[in-house]
Amino acid sequence: MELKTQVVVVGAGHAGVEAALASARMGVDTVLFTMSLDSIANMPCNPSIGGTAKGHLVYEIDALGGEMGRSADLVTLQSRTLNLGKGAAVHSKRVQADRRKYQQIMKSVLEKTQNLRLIQAEITEIITVETAEPPYSKRVVGVKTSLGETWNCDAAIICGGTFLNGRIFVGDVSYPAGPDGLLDAKGLSDSLLANGIKLMRFKTGTPARVKKSTIDFSQLEIQEGETDFLPYSWKTDLAHFENRTNVPCHIVYTNEKTHKIIRDNIHRSAMYSGQIHGTGPRYCPSIEDKLVRFADKERHQLFVEPVGENTEEMYIQGFSTSLPTDVQYEMLRSLKGFENAEIMRYAYAIEYDCIDPTQLYATLEFKEISGLYGAGQFNGTSGYEEAAAQGLIAGMNAALKTNGKEPVILNRSESYIGTLIDDLTTKGTNEPYRMMTSRSEYRLLLRQDNADERLTPIGRRAGLVSDDQYAKFLAKKEEIAKEKERLETTYISKEKATEFLINKGQDPAKSGVSLADLIRRPDFDYDQIAELDVDRPSLPKDVILTASTDIKYAGYVKRQLAEVKKYEKIESKPLPRDLDYLNIKGLRIEAAQKLDKLKPLTVGQASRISGVNPADISVLLIYLGIK
C-alpha cells in the first residue's frame, strides 16, 4: 500500500519529537514513526534536562518555538543552577525530571498537534531517486516500513538515536537491542549504506537503577535544589512551582574497596575484553574507564538521583559500567549506605551505528541526497538536549524546503545550537559530541537569559514562533529596555552613595552615581542596591535578571560584538554549492580536497575545516572576488 505525506520523521526520541513538532507547527503534513509509542521522548540514561551548556540549549530550543523546556518545567523534581561561582554567561540550569511524566506529556503534545500523525512502525528503507538538481546526486522520495508499507514524502529526517544495529553489553553477555532493552533497528543502516552514506560505530552506557528503600540515605550527603528559580519556558506559569516540593538528590563516593573490586574484575568488562569496538563518550566515561584514566584519584563522586515521584528507581550518576551483574552488585554494595542495596535494572553499555556528520550541510540536510536530514545521536552527538536542538533545526528546515523557502542556519555568534551544528558539519567528531560552554568563542553573548532576544525573531521569521510567544517576547523586551533606562538615569547623591559604600566596606564615592554604575561594580548586584532604589518597580524575575546582567557585562559584550562585526562580512559570505575547489589555482591540494569533500556553505565554515589554513582562505577570497 502506498501512502503520502510531506515530511517523514524516523524515530520519536528527543530529536524526533522536536523535528516532528516543528514541521507540523509550520503547517506541513508530517508523519512521525516510532518503534514503540510507549517509548516516546524516553530518557534511557540520566533523568535530567539541562546542565552545563545543555541548559543553554534548552532555553534556545524554547526561544525558537520548541517543546523540551515546557515539558521539563512541568515535571521538574528539583532545579539547580550550575557554575554560580563563575560569570553569568556560563550559569546553566539543570533539572531532575520525572521520566515517565515527561514521556506522557510529550506524547500528549504530539497527539494533539495539527498536521501530525504518529505511527508505530519500523522504517527499514529510505527510497531515493537520481536527480539532476546540483549539487545533489539523489533525492529522497519515500520510506518503507517493516510491515511492507511505502510512504511517499518530500523530505525525511532520520532520528535513530542508539537504535541502529544497537547491541547491549553486560560482561561477556551481548545481544541485539536498543536502549532499555527495546528492539533495535536492523534494516535502516543497510539502506543508508546502499545510498552512499558513511557510518561509524559509537558506544555509550548507563548505570544501574537501585531500589530506593534499600539505600540508607542517612549515610549520604544531601543535595537540595533551589527554592527560587526561573522556568525554562515562556509558556510556564511561575505559580506552577509555588507549592511544589523540591525532591533532594544525594552524594556518595567510591572508596578503595570499590576500586579494588573494579580493578580485580576489569578484564570482565565488555569495554576492556575487546567485545566493544565503538568509541565511547570522553566526558561521560564508565566507572572502570575512570579508574584507568584517573588512576591517582582516591575516590570518585557519585550522585543518587530520583527517576520519578511514583517509582522506587534511583539513578546512580557517574557509575555506568559494562561489568557483569555479580560485579555490579559487589561494587555497588561497597558504597557507604548501599550495603543492602538491590538493583532493579542492571547497568549496560550499548554500541550503535551513527553517521560522520561532515556529510551534512549546516541545515542538517545530507550533501548528496536532497530532502534527507539527520538529527540527534544519529549525527554523532550525546545527550537529550543536543538531540532536541538538532531535531528542531532539521524539522524547521525540512518544512521550509518542502515549501520552497530558504533554510535556517544559525551562526556561532548567535547560539550554542549554531556552534554545535557548525562543529559537527565542519570538523566532524570521532567520539560522541557533548556541548560545553568552552566550545563557544562567543559565550559572553550567549547567556541563558537572553536566548529569546537572540533567537525568537529567527523562529518567528521561519514561521514556528506563535503569536502568543512573540507578543510575550516583545512585552518582555520592552520591560527590560525600560528598566535598563531607569537604572541608568536614577542617580544617587555623593553623600548617600558614600554612606552606602562605607557601610559595605568600600571606598567613598567621588561623585554622585547612577544605580547602573553600582551594578557594574564587581561587589554589587541588583538585590544588594535595593536600599538605595526606593522607587523600584515590581517586575518579573526574568526581566530583572536580563536587565541587570546586561548592565553589569555591557563593556565585555560591547568588545565581543565589535569582534563579531569585524568577522561577520567574511564569516557569512556564501560559497556556491557547486564550486570546483580542485581547479582553483593556488589552493593547496590538501585544502582543495577537504573543501571539495565537505562543501562548506560559507567562508566561515571553510576556515574552520581541519587542514584549511588562513593562506588557503585568502586564495579562496581572491578567487571569489571578495578581496
Residue ranges and their predicted role:
Residues 3-15:
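Beta1/beta-strand and adjacent pyrophosphate-binding region of the FAD-binding site
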Residues 3-5, 146-155:
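Core beta-strand elements of the Rossmann-like FAD/NAD(P) dinucleotide-binding domain
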Residues 10, 150-161:
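Short hydrophobic core segments
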Residues 21-125, 147, 159-176, 183, ...:
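Conserved N-terminal/central alpha/beta ligand/cofactor-binding core
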Residues 36-38, 190-329, 426-509, 517-522:
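An anion/pyrophosphate-binding glycine-rich loop and adjacent beta-alpha core
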Residues 127-150:
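Conserved beta-strand-loop-beta-strand element in the redox core of flavoprotein oxidoreductases
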Residues 315-381, 409-422, 537-594, 599:
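A glycine-rich dinucleotide-binding beta-alpha-beta segment and adjacent secondary-structure elements
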Residues 439, 456-618, 622-627:
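Extended, charge-enriched "interface" segments that sit outside catalytic cores
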